[in-house]
Amino acid sequence: MTLPAILLLSGIILLGAYLLYGKYVFEKFNINDKNQTPSHQYKDGVDYVPSKPIVVLGHHFASIAGAGPIVGPIIAVTFGWIPAIIWILVGGIFFGAVHDLGSMIASMRNQGKSIGTIIKNNIGYKGKQLFMIFSFSTLILVIAVFADIIAKTFINNPGVASASILFIGLAVVFGTVNKFVADKKSLFIIISIIGVALMYYFVYLGMQIPFALNYELWLYILLAYAFIASVTPVSLLLQPRDYLNSFLLYGLIIFATIGIFYANPEIKMDTQVNITSENLGYLFPVLFVTIACGAISGFHSLVASGTTSKQIDKEGDAKVVGFGGMLIESFLAIISVAAVIILSREEYASSLSLKGPVTMFSDGLGSMMATLGIPEQMAVSFVALTVSAFALTTLDTCTRLARFTLQEYFEGAENPVGKQLSGNRYLSTGIVVVLSILLIRSGGFTTLWPIFGSANQLLAALALLAIAVWLININVNATFVLIPMFFMFTVTLTSLGIFAWKNFQEEAYVLSIIAAILFVLSIILIILAKKSLEQKPPIPEIGNSFK
């Protein structure tokens, strides 16, 4: 089979899944545009802002994509490109899309609150607090890691820093203008065209005016930006930046697809499936932890139930944003695999070691896009900058999500400190930023990062658990959620067990203990869920539910 044929077949499967399986899932969730969404019910102009579906899709897609659907699939090709593609397609359709849409709809039916609140309403208060501590800790780790990565990227590529600053300025202008023309479709289209054109121009301009600072300055500038992005109205900075940035990814997907079809490169990598890898371990469970974004990722549930659910205008918009957004990401993951299987297995192994996944992705697509008449170096730079731009999107979205998590954790607190943390977005964001700085300064994030893959997939399993219990409690057949849930618990518990034992043997006791704690956490939440179903408690009348 040729590379264009693989891409075409994958695209047809994903589109067919949206039209066929998607229809089944939409009916199971009883999506109804007559239901009032939280963005209208709790509209505050800061977090709850009803927005156009294309704008919300841009925010959601930009937030969930990042480097995940590029790095994970390319590393997982170590086991063979056929199992990687199969997991992306099966996982994206039956696991990830259900997980993302379910998180979004469950949140919308519960005041636009997070998965933690879904757990509280359906499993219990203890379950909520445990989940919130886990998700908050994970978000702080992600903020620290990405702040470090972006600061180093800006040092090595000052042009990327310049382009990123220009993007932020453009986003603020776009968000401000959009407030006055949002209700006028023709004007919105015009400012979108102008905004996207300027954004692509800023890609070029940024490379011409590199902006160089040292690591310390970039680190504090980035975290100051993250603070501002977390507390300002979502429609002023976060949403327009993500919306405009999403067109970089759309452009990347379009140019890459055309380039693959036009170049029609030979697939040099063999079809061998490796059950084990010297560096990674066994195909099960490692493949299913390594390919998260593109198949199923717990981080998506935090975005879907955190920022996105508060911006959905009508419930029907969640179909394309939640379910469709995941399938678009799956297609991007397929492109990532395509970018490296034009290498032989020996060339792949050497490049992975020397260059890393992002450079391999940039070089692979750059060479194919060059056949369209685009200078190869320009194409490679465009791909690399696109990936870097979405790292910044992950940083600002995670900061806002961590703020939401902290506020929800202390929601209903009677002590003065808890009340302040719950009600004051400036104080809660300040704590998020300070904790991130402390983690960076300590260097602890480099120690903790190896466990993120397993922790992220545990988030997915727990989100599916919350969705399943919620559906069962309102008398909906949850089999379509329970099957991926059981599989993901099997994957994550196996992965955590292996990880804990391996690190114990290597005397990396901190990682071993954390893995053991996460293992126990998941067991506790499963037991709490089982008890709640046996007791069948009444579900509080919060938000809109099924008719």
Protein language model features and the residues they cover:
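Flexible loop linkers connecting adjacent transmembrane helices
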Residues: 23-49, 75, 85, 89, ...
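Transmembrane helix-loop junctions in multi-pass membrane proteins
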Residues: 2, 68-70, 82, 141-158, ...
